[in-house]
C-alpha cells in the first residue's frame, strides 16, 4: 500500500481531530444459536431418537428437584445418553412430594417410607445433639466444684496467696 491510501484509511477510523484516540473495534458476540446448532449436530451423530408424549420430567438433586413441564426428550440407549430440553423450574422436595406420590408404584412407596423414617430419625437426632451441644458449651464457662462451695474455695486460695507474698 502506498502512504496516501494508508493515511486516508487512518482518517476514516479517527473519531475526533488530530491526536485523539481511534475508535475501538466492536466485538462480535457469539450467539446461543450457534451452540445449539453444534449440540444438535452432535446429538444427530450419536443417533438420538425423540420420545413423544412426556408431560413432566423431575431430576432429583440433593434436597432440590429440577422440574421440566412438557419437555422435549431425546434418548440414545446405545450411547447411554438422555437429553431433556425445555424451561426448568427449581423446587424443594417437600413442595413437589404430594404430586409425585400418586405416580409411584408399590416398590417405590416402600422406599419412600424408609426415607421418611430416616428423615425423622435425623431430625430427632439433630435436636438432641443440638441441646447436648448447648449444655456442653454452657459447662465450659463454669468451673466444676466437687464437694465444696465457691466461698470455701475462695477462702482456701486467700491464705495461700497471703502466705506466698
Swiss-Prot record:
Belongs to the NAC-beta family. Residues 120-134 have a biased composition (Polar residues). GO terms for cellular component: nucleus. One of its GO terms (molecular function) is mRNA binding. InterPro entries: BTF3 (IPR039370), NAC_A/B_dom_sf (IPR038187), Nas_poly-pep-assoc_cplx_dom (IPR002715). PANTHER family: TRANSCRIPTION FACTOR BTF3 FAMILY MEMBER. Part of the nascent polypeptide-associated complex (NAC). Interacts with EIF(ISO)4E. PROSITE patterns: NAC_AB. It comes from Arabidopsis thaliana. It comes from the Eukaryota. Keywords: Transcription, Transcription regulation. This is Basic transcription factor 3. Residues 33-97 form the NAC-A/B domain. Residues 120-144 are annotated as: Disordered. The keyword Ribosomal protein does not apply.
Amino acid at each position: 500500500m502506498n502512504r496516501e491510501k494508508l493515511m486516508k484509511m487512518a482518517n476514516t477510523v479517527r473519531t475526533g481531530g488530530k491526536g485523539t484516540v481511534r475508535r475501538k473495534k466492536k466485538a462480535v458476540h457469539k450467539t446461543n444459536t450457534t451452540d445449539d446448532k453444534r449440540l444438535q449436530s452432535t446429538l444427530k451423530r450419536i443417533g438420538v431418537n425423540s420420545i413423544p408424549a412426556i408431560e413432566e420430567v423431575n431430576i432429583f438433586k440433593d434436597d432440590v428437584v429440577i422440574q421440566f413441564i412438557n419437555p422435549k426428550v431425546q434418548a440414545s440407549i446405545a450411547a447411554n445418553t438422555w437429553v431433556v430440553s425445555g424451561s426448568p423450574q427449581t423446587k424443594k422436595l417437600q413442595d413437589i412430594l404430594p404430586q409425585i406420590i400418586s405416580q409411584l408404584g408399590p416398590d417405590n412407596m416402600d422406599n419412600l417410607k424408609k426415607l421418611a423414617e430416616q428423615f425423622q430419625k435425623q431430625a430427632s437426632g439433630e435436636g438432641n445433639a443440638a441441646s447436648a451441644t448447648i449444655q456442653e458449651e454452657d459447662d465450659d464457662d463454669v468451673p466444676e466444684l466437687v464437694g465444696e462451695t465457691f466461698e470455701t474455695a475462695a477462702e482456701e486460695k486467700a491464705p495461700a496467696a497471703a502466705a506466698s507474698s
